[in-house]
Amino acid sequence: MTIQKLNKNNHLPTTTVIDYENKTDDLRIIWLKKPANFDFTPGQYCTIGKNKIERAYSIASSPHEEFLELFIELVPENDGGVLTPQLWNLKTGDLVTIRPRAKGIFTLKEKHPNQLFVGTVTGIVPYVSIIRNYIHQNKIGHKFYILEGASYFDEFVYDNEFFKLMKSHPELLHFVPTISRPDDIKNSYWNGITGRVNNIIVDQINSLNLSPSNTMVYACGHPGMIEDVKAKVSNLSFEFLEERFWKDD
C-alpha cells in the first residue's frame, strides 16, 4: 500500500537500511532495522520517508523477525517519481524516517477455513507477512490460496518462497501465478497459467471447490483488478476485503 505524505515533522524517528536487493530494474526489496517497540499485525503497513517525503508500504516480514522487509516498485523521476528514486539510491547504513506506528485493517480474518489471496506484483506483500506469521505461530485450521498476477514472470519475487511452502506445507498453501503477456519475448520460457488474475479467478474458485460458506476473498494491488475481482466474487456471495494502491512516486 502507498499513501503520499509531505512530512512537516522534523523530529520523526529514523531507522537504518540493513540491506537491499534489486529483483528487476524497477523492483527492489529493502530490509530496515525494526525500531524498538515497533509492533504490527501481519497485513499492516509502515510509513517511511526521505527528505520530508513519505509513503506507506505494506510490510512483508513477520512480527517475529528483527527487520522490516519492504517490496517496492520504482517510478523514475521522468515519470513523476519523488520518493522511490531516493529509495533506489539508498545504501546499507543509510537512514530513513519511520512513523512510530503501523496502520491498516487488511489483516487476516479467521472466520473461514479457506483464505483466497489475490494480488498483483507488490500487492502480494501483505500475504507474505500473514503466511510467515501463521507458520511461525504453528497455527492450524486454515488453508491459503494465492493467485498472483503479473505482466512478466520475473515480477514473481516471492514465488520460490511460496513453492517451497507448497512442498513443505501442502495442507497450508496453494500458489497459482499467472502472466498477462504470454506472447512477450520476456515470457518465452513461461509454461504456466496465462491471463489477468481477475479474469481467471472464477475458474480457479470453481476448480479449487471454494464456496462462500468456507472462503474469505482478499485483493491487493491495481485498483482496476480489485474492482473486477470484487464484482465477480460479490456476485457469488463471497465475503471480500481489499487494499488499494497504484504505483508509488
Where are these predicted regions, by residue range?
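FAD-binding FR-type
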Residues: 18, 29-117, 133, 180, ...
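Histidine-anchored nucleotide/phosphate-binding helix
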Residues: 126-137
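Ser/Thr-glycine-rich phosphate-binding loops at phosphate-binding pockets of nucleotides
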Residues: 120-125
